[in-house]
């Protein structure tokens, strides 16, 4: 029985296959928290599951055990109790769900039984996700806890990078995941103490370069391939990148984001080019069998203001630099409509149908109407609406 305990919100593939695997390897007992009955029941009924790394000629499997699972919908008090005595809280629930998990975390922080502050790390594909979570948590805290928050909790942003492809149909809890990973966490929030011990985590003073480089290279590249692939009738990401024309489009998009990353952060052109090549190699991997519809899902989130398309395009527009390839990706994403199993794609179609081009542009992207980028994106919206 471990004396270190981590609470992880989100029993999905990233939670089980990446975050929990690292926590488990570092000696923590992991307590999964979710609202999905099926996931919680499966975790409660099975004492272990397997994480298999794929993506090279060899595959490597690891067994994950020493965990428990709680349904926060039916057992909130139990979750509060666990957080009160835990060392770490992590989550991989999707940026839109942070506001729903915040109240129970706030109660756990209010009831802290440990002298040391709990580490709170959101593992989401979004810039400043832990800051967002902290804001929601603090709205629920008493004034006295809020004024002594440093004694109760330390909040650190993180950047995670690991591709979880489509899973085999009857995989159950077992997760197939790519071999490559990167998990960077801010170190400053833990000062003057040491950051928590999590094997494989890279603690950095300034997370912004890592998070933007990852979001505007991996996520922008992956999404560009997915939306072009979807609109050209391709099945998997590796099929898209085998197409000479589409491969070139993805590369041109990443040239634009590289220009931004090199100019904004202290990253050399050579380093960024090597990073781009590594990313293209990763997402081209046929072993991952990564479906374009899976990668493309949630187009509204992916078209939002600070996300993988509008985020870099807005920066480039402000710099007076080129962003034509990104506009192409934005168009393809806008055409990802009414895709079975993806609510946002239906919502996107509805917005485009029911609004003028300027209203639709503002609603979908969150861009200010007076922003340099707005007219160019509105033209793309008009084209898609036509």
Swiss-Prot record:
Keywords annotated in UniProt: NAD, Oxidoreductase
Briefly describe its induction: Expression is regulated by the cAMP-PKA and HOG1 signaling pathways via the transcriptional activator MSN2.
Q: Which GO terms describe its molecular function?
A: mannitol-1-phosphate 5-dehydrogenase activity
Quaternary context = Monomer.
Q: Which protein is depicted?
A: Mannitol-1-phosphate 5-dehydrogenase
Family, per entry: Belongs to the mannitol dehydrogenase family.
Q: From which source organism is this entry?
A: Aureobasidium melanogenum
Superkingdom, natural source:
Eukaryota
Enzyme active site:
214
Its Enzyme Commission number? Answer: 1.1.1.17
Q: Could you say which residues bind NAD(+) here?
A: 6-17
Q: Which Pfam families match?
A: Mannitol_dh (PF01232), Mannitol_dh_C (PF08125)
How is this gene product used in biotechnology?
Liamocins have high bioactivity against the pathogenic bacteria Streptococcus spp. and can be potential new specific inhibitors of oral streptococcal biofilms without affecting normal oral microflora. Liamocins are also able to inhibit human cancer cell lines such as breast cancer cell lines T47D and SK-BR3 or the cervical cancer cell line HeLa.
As its record notes, the protein acts as a catalyst of: D-mannitol 1-phosphate + NAD(+) = beta-D-fructose 6-phosphate + NADH + H(+)
Identify the GO cellular component terms for this protein. Answer: cytosol
Name the job this protein performs: Catalyzes the NAD(H)-dependent interconversion of D-fructose 6-phosphate and D-mannitol 1-phosphate in the mannitol metabolic pathway. Plays a key role in liamocins biosynthesis by providing the mannitol moity that is linked to 3,5-dihydroxydecanoic acid (provided by the HR-PKS PKS1) via ester bond formation catalyzed by the esterase EST1.
- Give the UniProt record's GO annotations in the biological process aspect: mannitol catabolic process
Top EC class, one word:
oxidoreductase
Q: What happens when the gene is disrupted?
A: Affects the ability to produce liamocins with a mannitol headgroup.
Q: Which NCBIfam families match?
A: PRK02318.1-3, PRK02318.2-5
